[in-house]
């Protein structure tokens, strides 16, 4: 099961390495990671999306994170997370049938922007939940996707 863990840390060299090693030692996969400075200088929020086997494993991870140097707090915000979004940039081979392409992207209206429409390629930006981004990629599989760049998940309480 996927869990969203939010940490607040002092912005020091090596902190991220120490935190990720906790997951590696327990063989939990980090699905997504994002880090951003807070409004308080020297403090950073790091959000992890992690595959864990059960809730007790999540509690163990939280306790281990809280013991680390430079960690101010660690919380499982999976059930409290009001907003959770990812950003994806896609370079796509230009579709031969543009009307079909427009029908495919229509459900993502408001979440998807065509950044550049060239003769050979289309550059797309989309913002949404993890599942929305996965659905978009699945829908676009009929076209040659030549490049993808995707951020980690960002969440707010």
How should these model regions be labeled?
Residues 1-4, 10-45, 52-157:
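Long, contiguous binding/interaction regions
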């Amino acid at each position: 099961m996927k869990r969203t863990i939010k940490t607040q840390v002092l912005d020091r060299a090596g902190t991220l390495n120490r935190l990720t090693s906790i997951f590696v030692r327990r063989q939990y996969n980090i699905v997504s990671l994002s880090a951003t400075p807070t409004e308080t200088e020297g403090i950073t929020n790091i959000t992890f999306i992690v595959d864990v086997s059960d809730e007790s494993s999540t509690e163990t991870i939280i306790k281990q994170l809280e013991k680390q140097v430079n960690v101010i707090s660690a919380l499982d915000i999976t059930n409290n997370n009001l907003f959770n979004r990812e950003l994806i940039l896609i370079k796509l081979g230009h579709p031969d049938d543009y009307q079909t392409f427009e029908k495919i992207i229509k459900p993502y209206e408001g979440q998807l922007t065509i950044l550049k429409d060239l003769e050979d390629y289309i550059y797309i930006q989309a913002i949404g939940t993890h599942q929305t981004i996965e659905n978009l990629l699945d829908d676009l599989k009929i076209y040659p996707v030549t490049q993808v760049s995707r951020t980690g998940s960002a969440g707010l309480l």
